[in-house]
Design a protein with these regions (language model features):
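Broad hydrophobic/π-residue packing in well-ordered secondary structure
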Residues: 19, 23, 49-57, 91-92
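Short linear sequence motifs
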Residues: 21, 44, 48-49, 75, ...
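Functionally constrained cores in energy, signaling, and assembly domains
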Residues: 17, 40, 44, 87
């Protein structure tokens, strides 16, 4: 069985490079396909196609919210565009 969300992530054309994803602990972890470094973590919110977007904080050494005032929740397509264009997700690649 192939996960439709993983397929959508892996088919996304990211200008920074190809992504691959794996399902873990109620969410998805996205990696840079070239380096294998983690890029982002997405947790599904509710029953809809909306995700809480997290980045790896080198300071906190854990996944952290991207928004200045809390969580950033976006539909999958908007989330992928957001990840592709924000530098905070690419510090470890």
């Amino acid at each position: 069985m192939t996960d439709a969300i993983i397929q959508q992530i892996e088919q996304f054309h990211c200008p920074r490079g190809r992504l691959f994803a794996e399902r873990r602990n109620r969410g998805y972890t996205l990696y840079d396909a070239q380096s294998g470094a983690p890029v982002e973590r997405m947790r599904q919110v509710g029953q809809q196609d909306r995700f809480d977007i997290l980045y790896w904080s080198l300071w906190k050494e854990r996944w952290a919210s991207t928004g200045p005032f809390g969580r950033t929740i976006l539909p999958i397509n908007d989330a992928l565009q957001f990840i592709a264009h924000e530098d905070i997700f690419w510090v470890m690649t």
